[in-house]
A protein has these predicted regions:
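Phosphate- and divalent-cation-binding pockets in alpha/beta enzyme and binding domains
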Residues: 2, 54, 75, 144-146
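Short beta-strands and strand-loop turn motifs
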Residues: 14-20, 69, 102-106, 137
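Short, charged, surface-exposed secondary-structure boundary motifs
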Residues: 24-29, 76-77, 167-171
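Donor-nucleotide binding loops and adjacent catalytic segments primarily
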Residues: 83-174
Length: 174
């Protein structure tokens, strides 16, 4: 976000991809950053007409907002062969359609003790209710919190280091 201010002062054009996306949670630093970049950008590239309308209603001139769509479909399409070729299911001994994939690492879920315990208790309850493996792509923040609290996850919860793009998307697809 600070680089945008420096670029603006140096008269470097700023193009903001994902412009107008909002979660409306002012506690998240990303929300503040989005608003600053939206206002500062010379060109705001929105994923949807909804995001564009939001920016225009907030005062961003229409001539600085463009709906370009999400690049995610293109990224997935361009990587589909590598995603399908991933052998992550075999490496982890998982069966297609017979596991739950979990990623939980946001500050508000992990760093607030009550939220963390509520989340981990819910994970354990899911493991018990569905009686299937839960693959937890455990980010450093989460791992540190688990170790610090000594929280015991259900034996069906498999903690794994963060996964790469192809492996993670393969797991999501299966």
């Amino acid at each position: 976000c600070l680089s945008v201010i420096g670029a603006k002062r140096l008269h470097i054009p700023i193009f903001h991809m994902e412009a107008g996306n909002r979660c409306f949670d002012e506690c998240l630093p990303e929300e503040t950053n989005r608003r600053i970049v939206d206002v500062t950008a010379d060109v705001n590239m929105c994923y949807s007409e909804h995001a564009r309308r939001y920016l225009n209603a907030a005062g961003t001139p229409r001539e600085r907002t463009y709906v370009v769509g999400s690049p995610m479909a293109e990224v997935l399409h361009d990587n589909l062969e590598q995603i399908k070729a991933s052998d992550i299911l075999e490496r982890l001994g998982l069966e297609k359609g017979k596991y739950i994939l979990l990623s939980a690492h946001r500050e508000e879920n992990i760093d607030t003790e009550a939220n963390f315990f509520n989340l981990m208790n819910a994970v354990n309850a899911m493991a018990e209710k569905y009686d299937m493996p839960i693959l937890y792509s455990c980010h450093p923040r989460s791992k540190k919190r688990l170790e610090a609290t000594g929280f015991i996850l259900d034996s069906r919860v498999i903690q794994h280091e963060p996964l790469g793009f192809h492996d993670y998307n393969c797991l999501q697809m299966n």
